[in-house]
Amino acid sequence: MKLKMYHDSNCPYSRKVLIMASEHQLGDIFDFVSPFSKAGQETLVEDNPLAKMPALVVSPGFAIFDSRVICRYVDSLRKNTPSFYPAEGEALWRALRYESLGDGMLDSAIAARQELTRPKEHQMPERLEKQLAKVYAGLKCLERELDRLEGPLT
């Protein structure tokens, strides 16, 4: 049975879920629904009151949303591939911390891009600088902790 996933191909969080599924050889488990299609618009808010991408309907009347939660769910479906998440302890908390750091950097990069798409007269350089500073701080954090990361970096 395929799982209904509300998915926008321009959404980096949707792509994050697709990468997780692909790494676990589960890329064919989704039945994609565009939030912009008539069918998607009619059911999205019923399944996900926040109407954010991605959202995954795992059983009738029960959807999970937020890419972090969906990635954990997809990771739990794996069969012949190792988990992306350590089982417990500090290693798990580090992995979740890196995931949060990556999502936060992505949030800031998106906010910076949105600022640049505003009409020039409405742009706020301070906001752009603040968002980019968060991205750079996240990169510096990863650089400092590079020796703690295990496995191949892709």
Which residues does each PLM region occupy?
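Amphipathic alpha-helical packing segments from all-alpha helical-bundle domains
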Residues: R127-L146
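GST-like domain detector, emphasizing the conserved glutathione-binding G-site
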Residues: M1-R127
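GST superfamily/GST-like fold recognition
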Residues: G151-T154
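A general structural signal marking secondary-structure boundaries and capping sites
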Residues: R78, L146-L149
